[in-house]
Amino acid sequence: MFHGIKGCMIPMYWWLLGDLDLNGVRNSASSYSGGVNLSKLAVGLDLSEPASSKWSSTTSVKFEVPGHYLLQTLYMCVRLTMTDGRYQRSGRISYNMQNSLLCSGNTHDSMVVLKQESRFAKATDQGLSHFSMQIEQGIPVVSNWLIFNRFKFVASKGVRFGPAFPLASLTGGSIVGDMTPYQAFAIGGLGSVRGYGEVAVGSGRSCLVANTELANKMTEGTIFLDCGTDLGSSRLVPVSSLYLLRTRTIKKLLRHENDKAVAELVSGNPSLRQGKPGFGYGFGYGLRFKSPLGHLQVDYAMNAFNQKTLYFGITNLASST
């Protein structure tokens, strides 16, 4: 099977590193959000094994070349001030940059990915059970290609008690080896932790998200509680080599030796730089309506900071788990 060019808009965050003075890094950094255009060329083969009554399995191998374009602005201001009759130099570098998402520091990465996916699904009048496991292995055909192991699982269970239908779901995953920032597990938003924006809870090398719902067939309503965490792994999300090189260039321009301050800049951890908590929970209620398009979903959620969000969606209870 041939997989063509894919283009998508993914929610990411841009930030302004702020002012760097000659003695270190100031604490007044501002941030803003936007979109990053990420394109991926993928060529590969899929092999689907014969499915049993409840289990199915798919194995695939793909050559992938994700890439994007980096836009940046770099300028330096130097100011002379007089103190005790002598001029002293101070300055700042404003570095307005869309942080590179790629591991290589170039406009694209290259990787060969072997993927194994297994699914179990069972649905009866009394309830439903669902489990899926994905394992991806990056194969270093060439020395500078990415090598990693990434797995993700989703387990769901629902049991019917008269008109009530409680449903619980647990999602988790982790990645070891080479990693690009766009491979981080995103936590927050519809389908994850409701009450937060997309990726507003955090992004890390690992994640664990729990969702619980109690639906009532008579009222077509549901109450829910979501919680998610990056398991403290956001600090392990790397910064691109291009970003590292340019931050070192800033240090050279400023001619200071505050290695600790520079280390804080290049340590990665985009969640910390953007004030993401790394853990969050949300709760609320929703309504479900059947329509020719599917199940219409309306959820009203509040998070740990008492912020409220209204979600709309079209989903199917059996497939969304």
UniProtKB/Swiss-Prot annotation:
Expressed in germinating seeds. InterPro entries: Bac_surfAg_D15, D15-like. It is found in: Plastid, Chloroplast outer membrane. Keywords: Chloroplast, Membrane, Plastid, Plastid outer membrane. Gene3D superfamilies: membrane protein fhac: a member of the omp85/tpsb transporter family. One of its GO terms (cellular component) is chloroplast outer membrane. The keyword Plastid applies. Disruption phenotype: Reduced rosette size, delayed senescence, and reduced starch accumulation in chloroplasts of sepals. It holds the Pfam family Omp85. The keyword Coiled coil does not apply. Belongs to the OEP80 (TC 1.B.33.2) family. May play a role during plastid development. This is Outer envelope protein 36, chloroplastic. It comes from Arabidopsis thaliana (Mouse-ear cress). The lineage of its organism: Eukaryota, Viridiplantae, Streptophyta, Embryophyta, Tracheophyta. The gene is P36.
